[in-house]
Amino acid sequence: MATVTEVLTEPFTAQGVTLKSGPIKVHQEELPAVELSDIPLPPPSKEPTEVLSIDKPTPDYHVPRDPRLIRLTGVHPFNVEPPLTALYDEGFLTSPELFYVRNHGPVPLVKDEDIPNWEISIEGLVEKPLVLNFRDILQQYDQITAPITLVCAGNRRKEQNVVRKTKGFSWGSAGLSTALWTGPMMADILRSAKPLRKAKYVCMEGADKLPNGYYGTSIKLNWAMDPNRGIMLAHKMNGEDLRPDHGRPLRAVVPGQIGGRSVKWLKKLILTDAPSDNWYHIYDNRVLPTMVSPEMSSSDPNWWRDDRYAIYDLNVNSSVVYPEHKEVLDLASAGPSYNVKGYAYAGGGRRITRVEISLDKGKSWRLANISYAEDKYRDFEGDLFGGRVHMSWRETCFCWCFWSLDIAIPELENTDAILVRAMDEALALQPRDMYWSVLGMMNNPWFRVTITKENGTLRFEHPTDPTGPGGWMERVKKAGGDLVNGYWGERQAGEEPTEPEPEKEINMKKEGVNRIIDLQEFKKNSSDEKPWFIVNGEVYDGTAFLEGHPGGAQSIISSAGIDVSEEFLAIHTQTAKAMMPDYHIGTMDKASLEALKNDNAPQSDEPRATFLQSKSWTKATLVKRTDVSWDTRIFTFQLQHDKQTLGLPIGQHLMIKVADPTSKEAIIRSYTPISDTNQEGTMDLLVKIYFDTPTVKGGKMTMALEKLALGSEIDCKGPTGRFEYLGNGKILVSGKERHVSSFKMICGGTGITPIFQVLRAVMQDKQDPTSCVVLDGNRQEEDILCRADLDAYEALDSKKCKVVHTLTKAPDSWTGRRGRISEDLLKEHAIPDGKSMVLICGPEAMEKSARKILLEQGWAESDLHFF
């Protein structure tokens, strides 16, 4: 990233074309009070250079992307939002790699050499129709640079989908991003064509060819010509040429309106006397009246053709970012207050004038502090990224703002929810209740974060989780709460619980795929390189997901050539199931399915040297149970014979299948034994039992294990996992070998088990020079697991092994560290050096916190491994 001075002084070009504004100039003499460093500049950006394996088989095979983005519609088309906290933590401006994306279809392939001659036409009701190429646009028109927030009309739609399924796919609350856009004003382009008097609308059309034609929409001509509206064409974002997903090489940017009006890959501006008749303008981006059901909208197209229901300006909206969804606040280590913070925005250039927070269900409100970073550009006059920043005269607001408020911890303890609402300068206020509509767009009720008190902590929950099931709305609905009763589903006195709607079965088949596959073809195409597998009689090709699978390629390879219905359905989320149509290739005929069952039956009862098999389950018998503490056990299982070893590579895990004691349904989870990999005849599992509490249901698997009688059998299968330690600093990650000189091991609770496996392998080999630092976080001293072994390894060689324990509820006699695994602790013991790897396993909140801190400290994503 260039320094501030470099950004503001070097000449700028776009794809080799020099901009009209020429060399960059800064007019400091007019604004003596403004320092260059006061202007928000883009965050550090690292453009992806490799196409993700998940995209290689798709029409977007040419588009490198950031793997952190959350895919909302499976593999293709590409519709994503960034993780909410990552988006917020980047600051006012968003890097291109984290900028949200809404694509209706394939991204047009635009080669570098074609860009200077990229053409757009200005036609329709004009006196002088024009065709301009990219060079013309850069060289013949004044260039401006302005900060603008784009927001998808579907932002927060998942909340509507929980209440009642809409026709739109689910978005969380991160469907927005902000950038510095550079290019000419649309008005200047249109004036060149001399619009006729009867022209009322500007219809825009992109180069993305879709099933119903090219994507197009329209805005009013008087908006495009109004300098206060700031509507422009852009060829740069944050000083970089547009990337493919964001409209390379040219797009429209319509501030204050929904993102769907900012057409990407722009090819046409057509002036008309009526709104666009493009299919995507009519059947998308509308808020139909709430009484219109999906069935009504499908049977009567007149609902869609009424332009009164079209969306243009954004409405007022806000969201909480901190506390995060699923964040857990330990009251023992918490400070006197918590800084609640988030974002807000409005539409049509209107300023957010207040953000209010309530802790008593809306009976009383307090004002949050608001930061308007956009205003800093109004005090600056100069050129930035090849465009003039000239906002001192303009009072319209086109960007999000950040808000915050310190709330005393006792106040959070005494409430069950945080409510947030915003108001703009037109006194438009976020409503308390949701306005459900058939497309689920413009969802903007008060943002509510629930607080659950349990075991000395406060657990926070957002309305939904964009990555899968979760959030207080789903929880309340499953418990029989009526989410539209005006009380967020809370039952009032005398109110009976409602019967929750049956959960809709997710379709895992690709529409239009009618191919019948027999056993011979299935076996022929079921290899490590091309793993075909079966779920519920349907055939899937997992090749494209070998590299991207969170459990490692082996998880898919182990499924090759077999029916994995039971384990797939038991362990995969709704999000994972929704991805399956992208890999669906056909249906297996019934005769072949029956033959496959027999084909996959165990072939031999001959004793094996190793216990685990990657493609079939093997039974182990519970022979011993040792209580480590009131809620932690070591379960010892007998293998098939006394000389048999487990066969689990160091750093990997195995799947365990147990029948639910009540429903008898299979429960499948992954575990890492604490027994030595060379131990013969038995294996030991260290398990923390999650018992039922008055507010939280206990862990299904751990409760099932707790109820196992001696002599009971479990099923085991494996190995699985992306990581393997080979010894002497050599590791395999997703099949790729590398060398490290040290491990920084971060764990909490039973997350010690995979960490312990690697540590033991290093310490047992006296010739292994790899050093290890273990940061082990727990609540109380009795919760520290494997402590005797950890202390013994440190005593054996303190230079090779260092163990740091930290407790959140330490007794007065405790002489070790106190508190959570914090930023200070990681700065002290986990400094990035380019030769180390961080291994992490523990509660989700701990893992998320550690990941955020480590990335901020300079660790690369590829140097972090989460078990």
Swiss-Prot record:
Gene3D superfamilies: 2.60.40.650, Cytochrome b5-like heme/steroid binding domain, Nucleotide-binding domain of ferredoxin-NADP reductase (FNR) module, Oxidoreductase, molybdopterin-binding domain, Translation factors. PROSITE patterns: CYTOCHROME_B5_1, CYTOCHROME_B5_2, FAD_FR, MOLYBDOPTERIN_EUK. Mo-molybdopterin binds at C152. FAD binds at R669, S670, Y671, T672, L686, V687, K688, I689, Y690, F691, K700, M701, T702, T753. Keywords: Disulfide bond, FAD, Flavoprotein, Heme, Iron, Metal-binding, Molybdenum, NADP, Nitrate assimilation, Oxidoreductase. NADP(+) binds at M837, V838, L839, I840, C841, G842, P843, E844, A845, M846. InterPro entries: Cbr1-like_FAD-bd_dom, Cyt_B5-like_heme/steroid-bd, Cyt_B5-like_heme/steroid_sf, Cyt_B5_heme-BS, FAD-bd_FR_type, Flavoprot_Pyr_Nucl_cyt_Rdtase, FNR_nucleotide-bd, Ig_E-set. Its cofactor is FAD; heme; Mo-molybdopterin. GO terms for biological process: nitrate assimilation; nitric oxide biosynthetic process; sulfur compound metabolic process. Heme binds at H549, H572. Binds 1 FAD. Nitrate reductase is a key enzyme involved in the first step of nitrate assimilation in plants, fungi and bacteria. This is Nitrate reductase [NADPH]. It comes from Aspergillus niger. The lineage of its organism: Eukaryota, Fungi, Dikarya, Ascomycota, Pezizomycotina. The gene is niaD.
